[in-house]
């Protein structure tokens, strides 16, 4: 693959020998080192099961790794099970009441709409939705919706719909000016480009690890700022929160983000994620961004030249490009499958997401398929 593999990572991903995989926005393949970590965990569970208990201590290593990745501190990191759990922790912990409102935009993930519609019905809150304009949602679109009764402003840092990458700081400033919490679902962002929770003004962030973080299912790092941590009420309890046992079955609970780690986690998934974060750190997130956003730009230009209508706005700085399909979905799927090119085809759209192991040649191969779909 020569110069088309500037990161030198293609050999780490066996899938590249079999097909052109441009679907990491759905599920990313994992590198060999992560496979090895997961295999080692399962082998030890089979042959030395009592040693699995020692993995509890490795949580602190994982917290430190993720904290470095997002410019936080380890005591601001909890280890949850899924992205959806993070926003539920925020929504339940703020004790929303009738008359409060939550502001999202229509490029957000479905979980948020399910959550806040349920809270509309059960607690009488109001869900306010900023509309997108040609695939973008700017701070100016949020501004009219945020007021003194806004408790949460929630966005997907990068939209799963079209890869739109929000300009976070202006939205954070609007939220904070009214005393609201700024939360982000970052599953389509962490691992794709450098994340700085301080510079962005994010109060809380959660992300599953099976997409751009190159790991498995069942673990989702959760960042919560110290200031917000002090405001959140706990809605679930268990032994993993305990800092100190007191007489007569009383307990002193952790005051750091570990207070949200209430029960045993998926230790195998945690081991895989630790290996994946080490891999990402070795390759370099900034280098990954330069390569993958470059591939996405090449793809965007090619699709535009072919005459496709694009849902992704021009100049967008993410690794996801979505085009509208004009042919029947069955025909579109068949065209990509015949070429052994994996993308997401659904709801009249084609989402294409190059990752660190993809090459410019593969983008050109994809464009050969889309040329036949004009």
Model-based region annotation:
Residues 1-374:
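Pyridoxal 5′-phosphate
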């Amino acid at each position: 693959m020569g110069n088309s593999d500037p990161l030198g990572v293609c050999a780490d991903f066996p899938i590249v020998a079999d097909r052109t995989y441009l679907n990491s926005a759905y599920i990313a393949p994992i590198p060999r080192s992560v496979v090895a970590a997961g295999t080692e965990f399962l082998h030890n569970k089979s042959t030395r099961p009592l040693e699995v208990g020692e993995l509890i201590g490795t949580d602190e290593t994982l917290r430190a790794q993720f904290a470095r990745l997002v410019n936080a501190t380890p005591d601001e990191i909890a280890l949850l099970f899924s992205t959806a759990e993070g926003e539920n922790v925020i929504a339940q912990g703020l004790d929303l009441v009738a008359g409060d409102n939550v502001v999202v935009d229509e490029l957000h993930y479905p979980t948020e709409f399910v959550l806040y519609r349920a809270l509309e019905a059960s607690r009488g809150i109001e869900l306010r939705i900023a509309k997108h304009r040609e695939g973008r949602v700017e701070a100016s679109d949020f501004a009219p919706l945020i007021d003194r009764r806004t408790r949460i402003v929630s966005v997907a840092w990068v939209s799963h719909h079209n890869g739109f990458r929000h300009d976070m700081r202006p939205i954070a400033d609007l939220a904070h000016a009214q005393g609201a919490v700024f939360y982000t679902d970052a599953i389509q962002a962490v691992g794709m480009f450098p994340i700085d929770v301080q510079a962005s003004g994010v109060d809380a962030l959660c992300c599953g690890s099976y997409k751009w973080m190159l790991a498995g299912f069942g673990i989702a790092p959760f960042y919560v700022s110290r200031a917000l941590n002090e405001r959140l009420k706990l809605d679930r309890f268990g032994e993993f929160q305990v800092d100190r046992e007191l007489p007569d079955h009383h307990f002193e609970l952790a005051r750091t983000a570990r207070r949200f780690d209430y029960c045993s986690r998926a230790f195998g998934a945690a081991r895989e994620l630790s290996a994946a974060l080490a891999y990402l750190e070795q390759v370099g997130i900034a280098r990954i961004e330069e390569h993958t956003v470059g591939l996405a730009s090449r793809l965007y230009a090619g699709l535009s030249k072919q005459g496709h209508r694009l849902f992704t706005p021009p100049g967008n700085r993410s690794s996801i490009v979505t085009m509208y399909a004009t042919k029947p979905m069955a025909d579109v799927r068949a065209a990509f499958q015949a070429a052994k090119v994996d993308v997401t085809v659904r709801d009249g759209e084609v989402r294409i997401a190059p990752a660190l192991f993809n090459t410019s040649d593969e983008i050109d191969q994809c464009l050969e398929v889309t040329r036949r779909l004009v």
